[in-house]
């Protein structure tokens, strides 16, 4: 498990763009991670998306999955951003949205390592709420030295 303080060591993002609240399962040997994002009505994006019928923007669900995948990548490599390495989200394949994410939901983020080649990493990701899949995608990240 990782609390928010340890997560901040592995992700360079900060409020309001840090979208992983807690890591509940991290299996470096099995190359997978499970984390949570607690979705509050106080999220700044709900002011405009949409005030009368708030739903979490899909691009932020994708970003949350990418951040969970980034933590897994850092842990697999045994490095942190402070060591001079970053993972940039560069694309996705097989992206599907299945259900809206609403204020009060707890988003479960899962990522599994698929491959890496020439500093391009691929992860199979999914996001669920109460066990129901709301989004899935293959997330592609580029590893870059600073």
From Swiss-Prot:
Keyword NAD carried by entry: no
Catalytic machinery residues: 49
Enzyme class name: lyase
GO molecular function, one term: (3R)-hydroxyacyl-[acyl-carrier-protein] dehydratase activity
Alphabetical UniProt keywords: Cytoplasm, Lipid A biosynthesis, Lipid biosynthesis, Lipid metabolism, Lyase
Pfam family, one: FabA
Localization of this protein: Cytoplasm
GO CC terms of this entry: cytoplasm; membrane
A single BP term in Gene Ontology: fatty acid biosynthetic process
Entry's EC annotation: 4.2.1.59
Top-rank taxon, per record: Bacteria
Catalysed reactions listed for this entry: a (3R)-hydroxyacyl-[ACP] = a (2E)-enoyl-[ACP] + H2O
PANTHER family: 3-HYDROXYACYL-[ACYL-CARRIER-PROTEIN] DEHYDRATASE
Function of the molecule: Involved in unsaturated fatty acids biosynthesis. Catalyzes the dehydration of short chain beta-hydroxyacyl-ACPs and long chain saturated and unsaturated beta-hydroxyacyl-ACPs.
Family indicated by similarity: Belongs to the thioester dehydratase family. FabZ subfamily.
Name used for this protein in its record: 3-hydroxyacyl-[acyl-carrier-protein] dehydratase FabZ
Taxonomic placement: Bacteria, Pseudomonadati, Pseudomonadota, Gammaproteobacteria, Pseudomonadales
């Amino acid at each position: 498990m990782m609390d928010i303080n340890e997560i901040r060591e592995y992700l360079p993002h900060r409020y309001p763009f840090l979208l992983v609240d807690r890591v509940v399962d991290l299996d470096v040997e099995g190359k997978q991670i499970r984390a949570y994002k607690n979705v509050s009505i106080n999220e700044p994006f709900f002011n405009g998306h949409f005030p009368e019928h708030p739903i979490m923007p899909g691009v932020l669900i994708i970003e949350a999955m990418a951040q969970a995948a980034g933590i897994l990548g850092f842990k697999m490599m045994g490095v942190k951003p402070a060591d001079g390495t970053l993972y940039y989200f560069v694309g996705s394949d097989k992206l599907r949205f299945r259900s809206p994410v609403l204020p009060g939901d707890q988003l479960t983020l899962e990522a599994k390592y698929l491959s890496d080649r020439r500093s391009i990493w691929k992860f199979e990701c999914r996001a669920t709420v109460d066990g129901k899949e709301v989004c899935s995608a293959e997330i592609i990240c580029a590893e870059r030295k600073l």
